[in-house]
Curated annotation (Swiss-Prot):
Coiled coil: none annotated. HAMAP family: NAD_Glyc3P_dehydrog. GO terms for cellular component: cytosol. SUPFAM superfamilies: 6-phosphogluconate dehydrogenase C-terminal domain-like, NAD(P)-binding Rossmann-fold domains. The keyword Cytoplasm applies. The gene is gpsA. This is Glycerol-3-phosphate dehydrogenase [NAD(P)+]. It comes from Acidobacterium capsulatum (strain ATCC 51196 / DSM 11244 / BCRC 80197 / JCM 7670 / NBRC 15755 / NCIMB 13165 / 161). The active site is at residue 197.
Length: 338
């Protein structure tokens, strides 16, 4: 039996908690940064703010709290599930006093830190090492809409860690008849796939919003995985990881699925709506690709990696080009070998 604290009560954190709660051998706690959200989940038996319509059955052992100290003192395994721009603050300002050498951490956040271009596991490691802690750390990646995981739809994802024993433990913790985990030791590749696919999903949405057709979508996905792979490999990831669940799998889902917030942002941009208006309409939910684009381009520039699709997504997000102008630019670039 594992004592698990899911730290983050957004859609993805709640879905993970619901999935794990179906396996009765775990003791499980869901932490929310918002006392109001925690109280709402307790009162209504579902997360009406971020994952409405997916009840927490009373028979399932999910304890919801806004008390970080209680959550971390309870936990053996910490599952870190919060927006990328909240990770450093959460670990430095909220979690740090309660972290101990006995903790093991799984990061389920996809993104890059704005100022440093660090992956989420690197951000967490940076905070831990400053406190003299070197904890087992793993990352979760792959095609996994929160709503479908919460509903128990068959899903396959990847867990990556340099600690093979911890990866194997997580594989056992998560795997059941509806969710299959593959293990990997390419932490960089898995995280880069999860972060970069959100940028390409915005581009795919733009194509849909402009009404440009399926050929254009296929081109964006295919050339998108090429530039994702270039940057991931330059950072130390493996090419084959980007061809797996954490790269191509997550990219296809996020570029084509109607539940993708990043794709939705692109669709609405393609239709002519302004970015601020689109983001306001997400109801507090986060489209990570909007923030990740600038960080990915900064990282790519530092490594001499060309990312033309990401660059055009950035110009559209910044209001420097219209969606149609960005697509026309991509189609008029000089010819090259594939």
């Amino acid at each position: 039996m594992s004592r698990i604290a899911v730290m983050g009560s957004g859609a993805w954190g709640t879905a993970i908690a619901l999935h794990l709660a179906r396996q009765s051998e775990h003791e499980l706690l869901l932490w929310s940064h918002s006392a109001r959200v925690a109280e709402s989940i307790r009162a209504f038996g579902e997360n009406r703010d971020f994952l409405p319509g997916y009840p927490v059955p009373p028979a399932l052992a999910v304890t919801v709290t806004a008390d970080a100290e209680a959550a971390l003192e309870f936990a053996e395994i910490i599952i870190s599930v919060m927006p990328s721009h909240h990770v450093r603050h959460s670990y430095e300002q909220i979690f740090a006093p309660y972290l101990t050498p006995s903790h093991r951490i799984l990061s389920a956040t996809k993104g890059l830190e704005d100022a440093t271009y660090l992956r989420m596991s690197q951000v967490i490691s940076d905070v831990l090492l400053r406190r003299g802690l070197d904890l087992p750390l793993a990352v979760l990646g792959g095609p996994s809409f929160a709503q479908e995981v919460a509903a128990g739809s068959p899903t396959a994802v990847t867990v990556a860690s340099k600690d093979a024993a911890f990866a194997g433990e997580l594989q056992q913790v998560f795997s059941n008849g509806t969710l299959r985990l593959y293990t990997n030791d390419d932490v960089c590749g898995v995280e880069m796939g999860g972060a970069l696919k959100n940028i390409i999903a915005i581009a795919s949405g733009v194509v849909t919003g402009l009404g440009l057709g399926h050929n254009s979508t296929a081109a964006i996905i295919t050339r998108g995985i090429a530039e994702m792979t270039r940057l991931a490999v330059a950072c130390g990831g493996r090419r084959e990881t980007l061809a797996g669940l954490a790269g191509l799998g997550d990219l296809v889902l996020t570029c084509t699925g109607s539940l993708s917030r990043n794709r939705t942002v692109g669709v609405e941009l393609g239709k002519g709506r302004g970015l601020d208006d689109i983001l306001a309409g997400l109801g507090g939910k986060v489209a990570e690709g909007v923030r990740t684009t600038a960080a990915a381009l900064g990282l790519a520039a530092s490594l001499g990696v060309e990312m033309p699709i990401a660059q055009q997504v950035h110009t559209v997000l910044q209001g420097q080009a219209s969606p149609l102008q960005a697509m026309q630019y991509l189609m008029s670039r000089p010819g090259r070998d594939e």
